[in-house]
Amino acid sequence: MKKIPLGTTDITLSRMGLGTWAIGGGPAWNGDLDRQICIDTILEAHRCGINLIDTAPGYNFGNSEVIVGQALKKLPREQVVVETKCGIVWERKGSLFNKVGDRQLYKNLSPESIREEVAASLQRLGIDYIDIYMTHWQSVPPFFTPIAETVAVLNELKSEGKIRAIGAANVDADHIREYLQYGELDIIQAKYSILDRAMENELLPLCRDNGIVVQVYSPLEQGLLTGTITRDYVPGGARANKVWFQRENMLKVIDMLEQWQPLCARYQCTIPTLALAWILKQSDLISILSGATAPEQVRENVAALNINLSDADATLMREMAEALER
């Protein structure tokens, strides 16, 4: 498994990490999954050379962290890079975020809330330190906390040995500059796929200039780029309001994936593997966060690391995706 250094830390990350949002189950994913299969999926990721497991309290109200914690009991702790997040809460107030089922989530990055969250995450995960601690969504009014205050408490947690590295998700360029003003920022998490390339405009160059790893999530657009979505599919749960799952857009994507078949034949790979290989081609700073809910999905995703996509084919795929936006 290819690895990349994490900022100025002594941590190295596999170029592919396991995302566990779906493993957490709950209303966002139309119910819970078989817990043993979820644990087996995490164990398979480790066997395949993936050392990073990403989770968050907001993934079904801590359930994802609990499942990850159960898997961690079966793995050598020093071989796993555990990444979880703070800033999305449900047991204290904050700025309104999403409602999941009948429960309201809030944004809160106050120092008091972060300290509560890190303690709860450590307990759910069953570990005594978190390798990468990431702000999940950035603070907004009315419960606004300046980045300076958030970074201050993260720096304290780092000095206390509770976290090893600091990350930020769902940030813009100004956020990144402000984080760097008050401390180190080792990694960001941003949405990126061949269908959503906005990150290329400013975030990717800024991170390259500052040695910040870019961890991309939703590289398969919540399953749309797996090639398993049929024309009669009706999206529900977390997919229901997504732009690319609107019927007209979804059908365009399905047409594009059919045009990928000659490329899949050339590289002897599947559609999702090709989509992941395209992302890896874009920058050596990129680490893919790829979700899976079954061991075989992990094995398929990892195959993308063995594809040496040519410049010409990467350009062709980009042009196909750009054509969907016209």
From Swiss-Prot:
GO terms for cellular component: cytosol. CDD domains: AKR_AKR11B2 (cd19149). Monomer. This is NADH-specific methylglyoxal reductase. Changing D232 to A/E: Converts the protein into an enzyme with dual specificity, i.e. that is able to use both NADPH and NADH as cosubstrates. Its EC number is 1.1.1.-. The keyword Oxidoreductase applies. Induction: Is 3.5-fold up-regulated in vivo in intestinal environment compared to the level for in vitro cultures. It is an enzyme of class 1 (oxidoreductase). The active site is at Y59 (proton donor). Belongs to the aldo/keto reductase family. Aldo/keto reductase 11 subfamily. It catalyses: hydroxyacetone + NAD(+) = methylglyoxal + NADH + H(+). The keyword NAD applies. It comes from Escherichia coli (strain K12). Can be used in an engineered metabolic pathway for 1,2-propanediol and 1-propanol production. 1-propanol is a potential fuel substitute to petroleum. One of its GO terms (molecular function) is methylglyoxal reductase (NADH) activity. Keywords: NAD, Oxidoreductase.
